[in-house]
Regions:
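Divalent-cation-assisted or electrostatically stabilized phosphate/pyrophosphate-binding catalytic cores
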Residues: 7-11, 32-57, 63-101
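Intrinsically disordered, low-complexity segments enriched in polar/charged small residues
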Residues: 26-28, 68, 109
Length: 135
């Protein structure tokens, strides 16, 4: 395989990996269709894209409260529930979905630039599956 082809495939993998991670982040705020409980990333003190967006959108007082809650009260179910509500209210989920769709689109566009072969349709299905999965 040529270097250009390898770079293109690598770029596709990177973009679909980002879309996959964002989809995983979204599960933390959704209904329990999957085995992952709600708020687990918050409990593990992980800053996900929806949460980062919310931290940028809220006022300084709320930002400090969220950060303090994650650092010091990450096992408090009522605080976790409030953080999830704030993420939803500020548009954090919509922002993350928009970004996930962007990386999905770029991955598909880059894949379509590659020559047709027996793997291309399978890769297209995999790329689409990443954002459609419910687990």
């Amino acid at each position: 395989l040529g270097d250009v082809y390898k770079r293109q495939v690598s770029k596709i993998g990177e973009n679909i990996g980002i879309a996959f991670q964002i989809k995983d982040d979204l599960f933390d705020y959704g209904k329990r269709k999957i085995g992952k409980p709600r708020g687990i990333d918050i409990k593990e003190k992980k800053l996900t894209l929806p949460l980062i967006y919310t931290l940028n959108e809220v006022d300084n007082r709320k930002r400090k409260w969220i950060i303090n809650s994650i650092k010091n009260h990450n096992r408090d179910k009522s605080r976790i529930k409030e953080i999830i509500s704030l993420v939803k209210e500020t548009g954090g989920l919509e922002y993350a979905i928009e970004k996930m769709n962007y990386f999905h689109k770029i991955a598909l566009e880059d894949l379509n630039k590659l020559p047709d072969n027996e793997f291309k349709s399978s890769l297209t299905e995999m790329i689409n599956y990443v954002i459609q999965r419910d687990f």
